């Protein structure tokens, strides 16, 4: 551990998603904790908003306020601020300060006045913005108190916690400030709405576009934070260009994202996990498809994509086009393989499709009936073997009661249907306008019997409480064969990295931070199970063809080749461990400590 003495710096990491799960930054902060604790020890502390529902599950208050963080919390409370100090209940158990944004809502008028008066940052009455500004004001007070007691490096993540930075600099509070943008706010909006985003990036009028999308206050905070930080960072080389043209500052360094990688000592361990979870996916697939038509599960591969519903940004459009081409090619080649493709995202729905639930219930009834018949046959066969002098195998049907024969027949009769398996598992609120469904219907990729590519669109995240899968998302990933994430806009991209960490091959794109990092730092990455689609230099049609080629190559692998590739992917995961990537963070902190206060 490098920093241990009371004279060495204290690191404060401030994030809206510390002990408050909203999106991907929660994964960044949480997974990094063990490596941060190992390096910084007791001089590391997080700051996040107090959200009672989240805190009830993940926060444990302390009675010990003897360290500098605890003392600063007591002083802040004495000023009338509702704040808590304790432990975040995640791996590493770091110290954390939680501050209730609502305890400063009575000061919002004054906060907004001075933001405009001193920094020309406009505001609105939007609820999230009010919370962010109130939280920021209290964070500024906390840091001002803490900076009187110790040397402090304060690392702010994203615009939601960026509002204190301009005033910390204006008031010359003795703190070294690092600010990280994980994705520029304007970049995300422009990429979703402008097909020529990357070509026109150099000529964007940020203020005009921010007003157009009604996000000028947030973008103004982001820009002020970027310019006010002693050290400005972003998560990938892909977003560096965005920062230059949309925030008007070149990042000082890049902080790539990692994971807390759990390596297996023996290769067969993660292979066994793949088989275990694949069997659970088999069960769902049998219930969903076999009612209409069966196919050979030994010749079936499971592909998936997941993430927030941004049809174009996440590359759902490219994935669908490539799947349609793959289906055509496999049919032309008379392939005996089947691809089941899962789209796991979040869209508004009324309920799970009753037909899907009914099919699952019938499948369970078939299983119960077969188990009962198996038990009855087993017991009677054992008795017959023990008492009979004949060594021939008896007629097994004779050991089944008429009741079970009738129930078996009726169950099978009620099971079979001539309807096609639904492509979507839920009743969507926007069924007619949903972009995934529109593509599937218009291209007739609707689970026809002769389709080699079958679709399961699951508009809800996978969790153990989910009645269709009943498993963790990470278990689902391990049970699949390939993750597909050819994003158009993705500052980093955790989903393919999660695949790699699970030993599952993945498709990414060179427009994502992760894909760009892979191309620049890993030799022969395709051989190691990471396929990078060249979207930067190619148009949509060429990229779709390249993706279809990769998918077909994977389908045509034999089982031994797939296992070998999973071994190579799992071997690659170590280079994305936070213990390897933390050096980038330490470089940023050393850079901040070496800057002058002015």
Give residue ranges: language-model regions.
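Catalytic cores of nucleotide-sugar-dependent glycosyltransferases that transfer UDP/GDP/TDP-activated
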Residues: 1-598
């Amino acid at each position: 551990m490098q920093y241990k003495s009371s004279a060495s710096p204290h690191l404060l990491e401030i994030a809206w998603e510390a002990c408050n799960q909203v999106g991907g930054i929660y994964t960044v902060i949480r997974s990094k904790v063990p490596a941060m604790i190992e390096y910084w020890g007791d001089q590391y502390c997080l700051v996040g908003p107090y959200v009672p529902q989240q805190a009830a599950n993940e926060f444990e208050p302390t009675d010990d306020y003897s360290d500098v963080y605890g003392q600063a919390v007591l002083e802040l409370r004495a000023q009338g601020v509702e704040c808590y100090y304790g432990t975040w209940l995640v791996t590493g158990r770091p110290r954390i300060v939680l501050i209730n944004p609502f305890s400063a809502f009575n000061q919002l008028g004054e906060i907004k006045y001075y933001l405009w008066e001193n920094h020309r940052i406009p505001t609105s009455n939007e609820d999230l913005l009010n919370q962010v500004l109130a939280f920021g004001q209290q964070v500024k007070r906390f840091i001002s108190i803490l900076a009187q007691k110790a040397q402090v490096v304060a690392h702010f993540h994203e615009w939601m916690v960026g509002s204190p930075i301009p005033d910390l600099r204006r008031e010359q509070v003795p703190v070294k400030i690092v600010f990280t943008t994980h994705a520029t706010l304007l970049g995300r909006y422009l990429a979703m709405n402008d097909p020529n985003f990357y070509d026109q990036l150099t000529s964007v009028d940020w203020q005009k576009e921010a007003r157009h999308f009604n996000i000028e206050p947030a973008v103004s905070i982001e820009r002020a934070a970027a310019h006010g930080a002693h050290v400005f960072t972003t998560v990938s080389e892909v977003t560096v260009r965005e920062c230059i043209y949309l925030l008007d500052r070149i990042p000082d360094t890049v902080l790539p994202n990692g994971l807390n990688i759990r390596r297996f000592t023996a290769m067969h361990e993660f292979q066994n996990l793949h088989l275990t979870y694949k069997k659970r996916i088999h069960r769902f697939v049998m219930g969903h498809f076999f009612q209409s038509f069966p196919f050979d599960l030994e010749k079936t591969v499971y592909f998936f994509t997941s993430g927030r519903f941004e049809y174009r940004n996440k590359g759902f459009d490219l994935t669908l086009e490539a799947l349609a081409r793959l289906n055509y090619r496999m049919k032309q080649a008379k392939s005996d393989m089947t691809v089941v493709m899962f789209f796991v995202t979040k869209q508004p729905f009324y309920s799970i499709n009753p037909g899907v639930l009914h099919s699952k219930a019938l499948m369970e009834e078939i299983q119960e009936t077969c188990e009962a018949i198996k038990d009855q046959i087993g017991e009677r066969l054992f008795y017959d073997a023990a008492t009979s002098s004949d060594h021939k195998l008896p007629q097994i049907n004779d050991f089944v009661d008429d009741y079970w024969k009738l129930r078996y027949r009726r169950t099978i009769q009620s099971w079979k249907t001539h309807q096609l398996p639904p492509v979507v598992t839920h009743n969507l609120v926007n069924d007619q306008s949903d972009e995934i469904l529109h593509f599937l219907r218009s291209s007739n990729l609707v689970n026809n019997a002769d389709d080699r590519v079958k679709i399961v669109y699951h508009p809800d995240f996978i969790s153990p409480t989910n009645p269709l899968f009943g498993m963790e998302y990470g278990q689902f990933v391990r049970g699949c064969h390939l993750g597909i994430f050819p994003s158009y806009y993705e500052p980093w991209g955790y989903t393919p990295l999660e695949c790699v960490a699970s030993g599952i091959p993945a498709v990414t794109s060179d427009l994502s931070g992760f894909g760009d990092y892979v191309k620049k730092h890993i030799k022969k990455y395709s051989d190691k199970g990471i396929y990078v689609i060249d979207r930067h230099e190619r148009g949509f049609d060429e990229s779709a063809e390249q993706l279809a080629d990769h998918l077909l190559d994977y389908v045509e692998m034999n089982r031994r080749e797939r296992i070998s590739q999973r071994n190579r992917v799992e071997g690659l995961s170590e280079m994305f461990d936070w213990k390897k990537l933390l050096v980038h963070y330490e470089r940023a902190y050393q850079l901040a400590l070496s800057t002058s206060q002015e």
